[in-house]
Amino acid sequence: MKIGFDNDKYLKTQSARIRERISQFGGKLYLEFGGKLFDDFHASRVLPGFHPDSKITMLKELRDQAEIVIVINASDIEKNKVRGDLGITYDMDLLRLVDAFTNNGLMVGSVVLTRFAEQPSAIAYEKKLKALGLKVYRHYPIDGYPSNIPMIVSEEGFGKNDFIETTRPLVVITAPGPGSGKMATCLSQLYHENKRGVKAGYAKFETFPVWNIPLNHPVNLAYEAATADLDDVNMIDPFHLEAYGETCINYNRDVEVFPVLNAMFESISGSSPYKSPTDMGVNMVGLCISDDAACAEASKQEIIRRYYQAMCEKRKGNGTDAAIRKIELLMKKCNITASNRPAVMAANVKAESTGSPAAAMQMQDGTILTGKTSTLLGASSALLLNALKYLAGIDDSVELLSPLIIAPIMDMKQNHLGGDKESLLHLNEILIALSIASVSDENAAKAMEQLDNLRGLEAHSSVILAQIDESVFKKLGINLTCEPKYEGKKLYRK
């Protein structure tokens, strides 16, 4: 992987920019944090060199000035809304976030239940949070939000919300997912702070789209691909162009809501500190791109991955044709097709020649390895073992796992643990078997030592894999795509 992003520069410039914005507002800033604070793998894929936890590392630079406020929509608690990438509900993810922030030495000041309307589940959750020692505040639905500004900026609007007690100059407002009410929470606090005679400010931190690179730069197009299901569209910020004569990039939702936000700022404090939605941001990512071509190529690969992801989601019954069509248009803008992903053709050709599911992986040196289905191993398991052998310098003819090891595990799974008679071992089972073999087998031990070197490699499967196998690829850091079809015709799949 060719590095295209200066992560050290980013940590310094980003924290400095936030400090500068705090001082601009007299020492109190509410910072709305969009996107992922932890494990931002999208950013690390399109900006090679960006560390997935860069944002939290940057916040740790400000730990003495910052406190965290986590907001959650009470309706999402009631509906048991699930975070798709983690498979856990928003209310559980909030607890995970509290632990993660605390473990990183950051202070979690409180939790806010937004759109609180006496929902039974929200009341029970509030009780649970308080029992865990967390401060909890309630914010209520406001009729006519966000357009009825006289109502919103009044005692019947923001005025009826609880005032969140904060003690530090930087208040980071974050949430388990979108639609949680981060911006409304910030604005409510500005209203209450102003009533108390405190001059507080608002700013927004979002990594994408990157405001100071071209509209159709692959990095920005990759963001559109990632949000294809949300109908987010990157656009030139018309307010910034009018105010400064400069072309900057923002996205439709921020541009659409800016006149309303501006009017709210004026109503709350008499004037607005911002002339454009771009002004509100503090993102410094664009200034830390060190190799534009490397980031552009990485982003094109991300768009292809998102294309396959969208097609597989449609096949599973979760996605839409509209999202697929949108990503196809983005691919045309970048002049790329699925064939620009080398592992795709290799996996599909192997599947066609063998008549069974196959998989392929592109190694760091460009070598393409494949795996085919056999009586004992599935294609993805065979591929993983082949990749480990390649990395460890073990001859391809060597069997890392003897059939004498695999066969009894298969027998136990199929005949004693209720497995399907035709089911093969999953990747996690293969890795457990390999780890056991490594105790007495030198080659298996060498292979195990290479697991970390799989991170960042590209793989493709000719069929949709079982969820457990997809999960193992993800945990190993391998970027997997699949053809949008299943092996076999059964309806129930694990």
Annotate each predicted stretch with a short phrase:
Residues 1-173, 189-350, 356, 363-365, ...:
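Flexible phosphate-sensing "switch/lid" loops adjacent to ATP/NTP-binding sites
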Residues 392-399, 411-418:
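ATP-dependent carboxylate/acyl-activation modules
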Residues 177-178:
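The conserved Walker
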Residues 185:
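Hydrophobic positions on the alpha1 helix immediately C-terminal to the Walker A/P-loop
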Residues 372-373:
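Short clusters of small/polar residues that mark proteolytic maturation junctions
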Residues 376-392:
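A short, polar/charged loop-to-alpha-helix boundary motif
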Residues 203-204, 399-406:
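Beta-strand segments within the central parallel beta-sheet cores of soluble alpha/beta enzyme folds
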